[in-house]
Amino acid sequence: MKLIKQGAEAKIYLAEFSELYFDYPIKVIVKERIKKRYRIPEIDLKLRKERTIREARILRRAKEFGVNVPYVFEVDTKNMIIVMEYIEGERLKELLEKLPMEERLKVCREVGRQIGKLHEAGIVHGDLTTSNMILREGKVYFIDFGLAEFDDTIEAQGVDLHLLKRAMESTHYKWFERGFEEVLKGYIEIRGEDKGREIREKIREIELRGRYRERSWITQ
């Protein structure tokens, strides 16, 4: 088992399935939520357990709604561990920049469809960036649901998409407007025109709020 990432909340390990269970030729991700020494131990334990269970439930519900996410093999609430499928492929962050424009836009539309299904399930990802999306065998997969929540409000869904737009503007700045428009078209294919208009209006509203705050800060 190899440590591949350590964040503020969790350690991420890559392991062979056979290391944990029985002989089977696949790899798995082992996500361990780490203790916070600054927290009261009882509160820390409660929070880590709640977040471990919530993430596993979110992944299960997302899959039920047809979202491409890792399959969960095990949830260990004693050690705060989730064992899940390793999605082997190429991150969209790098892949999109190598594809011809027509192919990029097709992938972006599929990203939108996947987000639409996720929001239909009453889930917001909380960290939608092309770094958390992987293309495997022609399918777009979402990973890293550590910040995800059960939330079906238009505000939360608008924030989810707004964060993706900002991330695309930063990473894919030369063509992000065309790309994000395709994301919205894919989203509308799943959720319908009425919800599409509602989400576009919410994204504009969120952007205006952000600009107002920036102007207020500058004039202070």
Swiss-Prot record:
Q: Where in the cell is it found?
A: Cytoplasm
Q: Which UniProt keywords apply?
A: ATP-binding, Cytoplasm, Hydrolase, Kinase, Nucleotide-binding, Serine/threonine-protein kinase, Transferase, tRNA processing
A single GO BP annotation from the record?
tRNA threonylcarbamoyladenosine modification
Reaction(s) this enzyme catalyzes, per UniProt: L-seryl-[protein] + ATP = O-phospho-L-seryl-[protein] + ADP + H(+); L-threonyl-[protein] + ATP = O-phospho-L-threonyl-[protein] + ADP + H(+)
List the transmembrane segments. Answer: none
Family (UniProt):
Belongs to the protein kinase superfamily. BUD32 family.
What the entry says about domains is: This protein is considered an atypical serine/threonine kinase, because it lacks the conventional structural elements necessary for the substrate recognition as well as a lysine residue that in all other serine/threonine kinases participates in the catalytic event. Bud32 has protein kinase activity in vitro, but in the context of the KEOPS complex, the catalytic subunit Kae1 switches the activity of Bud32 from kinase into ATPase.
Please report the name of this protein according to its UniProt entry: KEOPS complex subunit Bud32
Naturally occurring in which organism (per UniProt): Pyrococcus abyssi (strain GE5 / Orsay)
